[in-house]
Structures are given as C-alpha cells and as structure tokens.
Curated annotation (Swiss-Prot):
The keyword Isomerase does not apply. It comes from Erwinia amylovora (strain CFBP1430). It holds the Pfam family SecD-TM1. It is found in: Cell inner membrane. The gene is mzrA. This is Modulator protein MzrA. Signal peptide: none annotated. It is a single-pass membrane protein. One of its GO terms (molecular function) is protein kinase binding. InterPro entries: Modulator_MzrA, SecD-TM.
C-alpha cells in the first residue's frame, strides 16, 4: 500500500520544479520591456528666481506643431519633465525649446532608468552620487 501512494505522489513532485521554472520564466519575460525601454526625457527648469514654468499644454502644442510626438508632460519638483519615444525626438524638441525659451529656462536631458533608479525604488533611503 505504501508503494502505491508513493507512485501517486511522484508525478506531483516531478511537476513542481517545472512549474516553478515556468513561473520564473514568465516573470522574466514580463520584465524584458522594462529593461530595454528607450524613452528619453527632457527637463525644463527656470534659470532664475521669479520665472514661472511654461504651461505644459503650450509646450505640447508647440512641439506637436513641429511634428514631435510626446509621451507625457509632468510637473516634478519645480520643473517640467517631458518624455519622448526616442532620443531623436528628444534632441529635436530640445532644439525647438531652446529657440522658444532662449535664456529664461534651463533645458537638459535626464538620464534614463539605470541601476540608481532601481536601487532607489527598492531602498528605504535614496541613493545619491556626488
């Protein structure tokens, strides 16, 4: 009787490691798009005190009129962050915005998601370099 019960449990025990491997593989496949994301961001800040940020809708209209596709525009810590689908669109937008806002605003590229952003997401304390 014990051999019969052991034979019934063997297929389950053999199946469990394969289910775990399949689960880990599915999680890995779900994470691939986040690892190979190529979006690019620009940050607009006021270059001196007393200058207010430009309206996000105005920036959107201006860049759209130039044929530049924008993923999103969000205000973040006294700045305006604009996300684009590709670095080419980001550089084209930078040229347009530098002409438009001349000396009033600082326009800079933000670094893409790297190790520091992953560490900050899982850490209790933010990590800073420099």
């Amino acid at each position: 009787m014990t051999t019969a019960s052991i034979k019934k449990r063997d297929p389950r025990r053999r199946l469990l490691p394969w289910l775990i491997v399949a689960f880990v593989a599915l999680i890995g496949l779900a994470m691939i798009p986040a690892l190979f994301r190529h979006d690019s961001t620009l940050q607009i800040r006021a270059s001196r005190q007393g200058v207010s940020l430009p309206d996000g809708f105005y920036v959107y209209q201006t860049l759209s009129a130039q044929g530049i596709h924008i993923q999103s525009i969000t205000p973040e810590q006294d700045s305006l962050v604009i996300r684009f689908d590709s670095p080419e669109q980001s550089y084209a937008a930078e040229r347009v915005l530098r002409k438009l806002f001349a000396q009033s605003f600082d326009i800079a590229h933000q670094p893409g998601p790297g190790a520091a952003s992953w560490i900050n997401r899982i850490s209790l304390l933010p990590q800073f370099v420099g």
